[in-house]
Amino acid sequence: MPEAVSDGLFDVPGVPMTSGHDLGASAGAPLAVRMRPASLDEVVGQDHLLAPGSPLRRLVEGSGVASVILYGPPGSGKTTLAALISQATGRRFEALSALSAGVKEVRAVIENSRKALLHGEQTVLFIDEVHRFSKTQQDALLSAVEHRVVLLVAATTENPSFSVVAPLLSRSLILQLRPLTAEDTRAVVQRAIDDPRGLGRAVAVAPEAVDLLVQLAAGDARRALTALEVAAEAAQAAGELVSVQTIERSVDKAAVRYDRDGDQHYDVVSAFIKSVRGSDVDAALHYLARMLVAGEDPRFIARRLMILASEDIGMAGPSALQVAVAAAQTVALIGMPEAQLTLAHATIHLATAPKSNAVTTALAAAMNDIKAGKAGLVPAHLRDGHYSGAAALGNAQGYKYSHDDPDGVVAQQYPPDELVDVDYYRPTGRGGEREIAGRLDRLRAIIRKKRG
């Protein structure tokens, strides 16, 4: 019996699929799930991929055998096409989300598919957001795809040439989906208004409101249906039609509920960084959890933490950068969901670390001087003296080798003449910089002694 697409976009594989027109979507499922096309005739857009005899149409009609990677923007129909392929072929359907599945889950699904194949059952394996899989997770699929233990249908919003390992690319067809046109989106919205699976005309929607939904969707059918659903709920509660004003009042709520690509996404990222910088570890964990639950790319979070480690902590807590880099490496090596713990670990470490922006201000001051033209000649004794003729130019003459001094530090001019005695790095008195400040004073006193 084919297995179902869950209401949570494949969060729970192995749920039996109900028969009938709705592809397993319950009445309480989000509008975008209830309105998922149940046949090719209901698919809107992607005509370039669904022409007669095309690889994708053959798959959906049950005659294709090649694994595919569906590459396209959010809301363009990748999940829908995966479900249609399974339904049309009558094969077992297994679904994994790269956000929640690790190598263990991948191998378990493949093993179940091997057993099913012994009984003549072939399996369609759908992997949502495959670009979030680590190399190890992707490698675990190779043998099963090559020997057709599973027919892989993978979806990604990122260019697979950069996010999917080469051996998996070579074993799959790459099919690029295009954003829906305005007319495509309008057709999706109107169907949801009219169809009993959707609103079933239970609430009136002004034509101007439909226009606004199409505009806000920007080619993303799911975004349009999410906004429509929230607006319809508000309109029904107030006993009014869905107007432009209803849409405008509801769109922020819709973004918070379902959308990780709009303004709310950037607000949460900003709040996360500012909470870590502000040392509020609990708020930082809250915003981290919101990003993870919303499906934020863990690599993006790791990159932000690495930047913050130098920008807002620096030498006050030198281990912060090591922890942030280790977290990024862990994300790349093991992927999700296990890497969630590593991101939390790094977030806690950075939020509780002593803070300093002295590295940031030091580099900014040095670069401002360069832009202002303060880039004088390198002192002659510091210039390269290893080539023939260097000595005749005075290069490296009089250079003092620091290791010849018992303290490893000598009095010597290092900056150009224009920048002698300029202090760029000004450590704070916090964390590791408390000790550095005293040491730096001593170093500068030795180095800047009167030069002969």
Curated annotation (Swiss-Prot):
Output the superkingdom of the source species.
Answer: Bacteria
The UniProt entry's GO biological process terms, in alphabetical order, are: DNA synthesis involved in DNA repair; DNA-templated DNA replication
- What residues does ATP bind to? G72, P73, P74, G75, S76, G77, K78, T79
Q: Does the keyword field hold rRNA-binding?
A: no
Which InterPro entries does the UniProt record give? AAA+_ATPase, AAA_assoc_2, AAA_ATPase_RarA/MGS1/WRNIP1, ATPase_AAA_core, DNA_pol3_clamp-load_cplx_C, MgsA_C, P-loop_NTPase
Q: Which UniProt keywords apply?
A: ATP-binding, Nucleotide-binding
Molecular function in Gene Ontology: ATP binding; ATP hydrolysis activity; DNA binding; enzyme activator activity; single-stranded DNA helicase activity
Q: Name one Pfam family in it.
A: AAA_assoc_2
The text of the family note is: Belongs to the AAA ATPase family. RarA/MGS1/WRNIP1 subfamily.
Question: PANTHER family recorded for this chain?
Answer: ATPASE WRNIP1, WERNER HELICASE-INTERACTING PROTEIN 1 FAMILY MEMBER
This chain belongs to the protein called: Uncharacterized AAA domain-containing protein MT2636
Q: Which organism is it from?
A: Mycobacterium tuberculosis (strain CDC 1551 / Oshkosh)
